[in-house]
Regions:
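Short intrinsically disordered terminal tails
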Residues: 1-5, 73-75
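Short alpha-helical "recognition helix" segments of helix-turn-helix
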Residues: 38-40
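A short, Lys/Arg-rich alpha-helix, primarily the initiator
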Residues: 6-31
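Recognition helix of helix-turn-helix/homeodomain-like DNA-binding domains
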Residues: 45-59
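Residues in the recognition helix of alpha-helical DNA-binding motifs
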Residues: 28, 42, 53
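DNA major-groove recognition helix of helix-turn-helix/homeodomain DNA-binding modules
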Residues: 62-75
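Non-catalytic, surface-exposed connector residues within folded enzymatic/regulatory domains
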Residues: 19, 61-62
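Short coil turns linking two alpha-helices in DNA-binding domains
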Residues: 35, 46-49, 64
Length: 75
């Protein structure tokens, strides 16, 4: 497991649609050992919001999508 991510979260991320920007972000964060807390602090959102994006429960809304795309390009 990466950076304290549970097997359940990793599995939900794998099962979620990779068309979602939040799911893509989750896969990269898991791969590169970037914590949910770091992502939440960088984007100014709650950790729960980030978990929901990672698992495809919710999708990030503009203007956060631009910040997320920038973060993804840096990973």
């Amino acid at each position: 497991m990466s950076y304290g991510y549970t097997a359940r979260l990793i599995q939900k991320n794998k099962e979620a649609s990779d068309r979602s920007l939040g799911v893509k972000l989750g896969r990269l964060c898991i791969k590169h050992d970037l914590s949910v807390s770091e992502v939440a602090n960088t984007l100014g959102v709650s950790r729960q919001a980030v978990y929901n994006w990672f698992t495809g429960v919710n999708t990030p809304k503009p203007p956060l999508t631009d910040l997320i795309e920038e973060l993804i390009s840096e990973l």
